[in-house]
């Protein structure tokens, strides 16, 4: 079987740094699914408006390294503990496929390159190829009592974000709300803890620079 992209994702993230580690963590983060001409057909989306969430099957396109090891070091475990690759969601896997659950915001059938699917809560980089889209079905896909392995014991913390008003003026209200949620997730590598280091990430075509001390993240510059 050969597969090809059916669409590409548009998001505020031009690089991998800063992207939420999982979908849904920054639930207001907006993105758009743009179909390639071959699949730009409104009939293929008929009935989609009756669902709230979608599954996206996509490629870790920024990861060009061939996966050869059966184990990886999840950042959530500090980057030292080895876990089987198929017991993680690491991008370093044989077929480089990712799976994300996103909320449907709206479907634009009238756009010039439509139909476009506007979604919230994705964890994809701008330009990510999408190979399949499926509806999220609650009765089959939701398992609220399921165990989550090492993830259960390493709950992600949330930082207090200090974003000076004079630095926030270049963003729309929607962008600013989403950016604050992304920053609260602590975009740094899990093992970094230098309170004097200034980190930078690109968001919505702006360079966002910040530092973290304890549970406090302060935005210090917008470029």
Report residues per predicted region.
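Mixed-charge, low-complexity intrinsically disordered regions
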Residues: 1-97, 109-223
């Amino acid at each position: 079987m050969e597969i090809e992209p059916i669409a590409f994702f548009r998001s505020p993230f031009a690089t991998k740094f800063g992207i939420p580690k999982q979908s849904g963590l920054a639930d207001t983060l907006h993105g758009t699914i743009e179909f390639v001409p071959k699949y730009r057909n409104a009939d293929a989306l008929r009935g989609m408006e009756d669902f709230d969430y979608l599954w996206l099957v996509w490629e870790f396109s920024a990861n060009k390294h061939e996966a050869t090891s059966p184990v990886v070091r999840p950042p959530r475990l500090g980057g030292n503990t080895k876990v089987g690759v198929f017991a993680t969601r690491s991008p370093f896997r044989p077929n480089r496929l990712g799976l994300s659950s996103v909320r449907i915001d709206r479907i634009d059938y009238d756009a010039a390159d439509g139909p476009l699917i506007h979604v919230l809560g994705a964890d994809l980089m701008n330009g990510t190829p999408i190979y399949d889209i499926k509806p999220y079905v609650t009765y089959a896909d939701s398992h609220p009592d399921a165990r989550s392995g090492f993830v259960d014991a390493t709950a992600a913390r949330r930082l207090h974000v200090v974003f000076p008003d004079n630095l926030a003026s270049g963003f729309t209200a929607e962008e600013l709300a989403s950016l604050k949620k992304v920053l609260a997730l602590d975009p740094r590598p899990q093992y970094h803890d230098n309170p004097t280091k200034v980190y930078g990430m690109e968001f919505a075509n702006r360079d966002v620079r910040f530092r973290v001390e304890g549970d406090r993240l302060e935005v210090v510059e917008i470029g």
